[in-house]
């Protein structure tokens, strides 16, 4: 695994010439209940990308995008949102810049609120024939700061999880919550900011989820490379999106 932040520009040029793929973790800075840190989405995105890089030496991890579209978490202290338009513009410009060096650029997104601006950014970059695609974890389960995210955080940073503060939030299915979330945000349905129940989370479950996501990312990159080779041109577009990529908050 290579971190872009640790490399010099000549080293990066050599990596790009060897066919390396740049993977950009895309997270958010937002509340994750009383038990998880506000950088949870960043931490998870970076962990998945670095785990994937351990299996593919040609994956280069970029510094994470730390801010995104988190307006649904307004009203909770610590949430720092730049909105959808700014997120889209940021990703477009990052994609353009990264494609000047790398033959393939992947945006690995762990925050559902970024899904719409990322899709629009990918559409824009694709229309410019830039070799980019987006990826989301294929995780089912609860929506925000619940069992899934808590388990992954217990696997990657247990010292930062306050399990003594973990409690169920709104556990209704997404079909019952979506209209309320769109109109009033998370605060309108969950006083503690949780959508789901984190109390059953475990590090073992988190490691299983992390390993599966990393393997899926490696596979998605391999398929994209193959597509580029088979078409003989720069393939672009959205790839490997989970069922809840536009819903998880």
What does each model-identified segment do?
Residues 1-106, 110-233, 238, 242-249:
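Extended, histidine- and acidic-residue-enriched regions that form the cofactor-binding/catalytic faces
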């Amino acid at each position: 695994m290579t971190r872009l932040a640790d490399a010099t520009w000549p080293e990066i040029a050599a990596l790009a010439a060897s066919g390396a793929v740049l993977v950009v973790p895309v997270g958010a800075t937002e509340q994750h209940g009383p038990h998880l840190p506000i950088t949870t989405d960043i931490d998870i995105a970076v962990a998945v990308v670095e785990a994937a890089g351990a299996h593919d030496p040609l994956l280069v991890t970029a510094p994470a995008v730390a801010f995104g579209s988190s307006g649904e978490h307004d009203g909770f202290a610590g949430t720092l949102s730049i909105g959808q338009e700014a997120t889209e513009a940021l990703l477009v410009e990052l994609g353009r810049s990264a494609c000047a060096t790398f033959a393939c650029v992947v945006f690995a997104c762990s925050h559902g609120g970024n899904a719409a601006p990322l899709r629009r950014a990918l559409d824009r970059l694709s229309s410019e024939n830039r070799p980019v695609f987006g990826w989301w974890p294929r995780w089912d389960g609860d929506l925000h700061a619940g069992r899934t995210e808590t388990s992954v955080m217990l696997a990657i940073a247990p010292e930062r999880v306050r399990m003594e503060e973990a409690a169920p939030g709104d556990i209704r299915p997404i079909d019952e919550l979506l209209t309320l979330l769109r109109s009033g945000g998370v605060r309108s349905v969950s006083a503690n900011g949780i959508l789901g129940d984190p109390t059953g989370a475990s590090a073992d479950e988190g490691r299983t989820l992390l390993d599966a996501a990393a393997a899926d990312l490696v596979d998605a990159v391999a398929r994209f490379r193959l597509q580029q080779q088979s078409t003989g041109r720069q393939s672009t577009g959205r790839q490997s999106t989970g069922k809840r990529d536009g819903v998880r908050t």
